[in-house]
Amino acid sequence: MSKFYKIWLVFDPRRVFVAQGVFLFLLAVLIHLILLSTPAFNWLTVATAKHGYVAAAQ
């Protein structure tokens, strides 16, 4: 474990951190979209039902 710092000689730290940030952002978006697609965890329809908002007429 004491020579773990040598991993940065193989990988460019800037690319690793950018790739990690992009991955985490896309993972967060994916999780939110999955939750919005389920009726129990869709906070938009739950809030609409709770406060009695009516959809705008078209």
Swiss-Prot record:
GO terms for cellular component: organelle inner membrane; plasma membrane; plasma membrane light-harvesting complex
InterPro entries named in the record: Antenna_a/b, Antenna_alpha, Antenna_alpha_CS, Light-harvesting_complex
Molecular function as annotated in GO: bacteriochlorophyll binding; electron transporter, transferring electrons within the cyclic electron transport pathway of photosynthesis activity; metal ion binding
Membrane-crossing segments per the record: 16-36
UniProt KW keywords: Antenna complex, Bacteriochlorophyll, Cell inner membrane, Cell membrane, Chlorophyll, Chromophore, Light-harvesting polypeptide, Magnesium, Membrane, Metal-binding, Transmembrane, Transmembrane helix
Membrane topology: Single-pass type II membrane protein
Gene3D superfamilies xrefs: Light-harvesting complex (4.10.220.20)
One Pfam entry name: LHC
Subcellular location field: Cell inner membrane
Keyword Membrane annotated: yes
GO biological process: photosynthesis, light reaction
Residues the record lists as binding a bacteriochlorophyll: H32
Keyword field contains Ubl conjugation: no
Function description: Antenna complexes are light-harvesting systems, which transfer the excitation energy to the reaction centers.
UniProt record similarity statement: Belongs to the antenna complex alpha subunit family.
UniProt name for this protein: Light-harvesting protein B-870 alpha chain
Organism lineage: Bacteria, Pseudomonadati, Pseudomonadota, Alphaproteobacteria, Rhodobacterales
Gene that specifies this protein: pufA
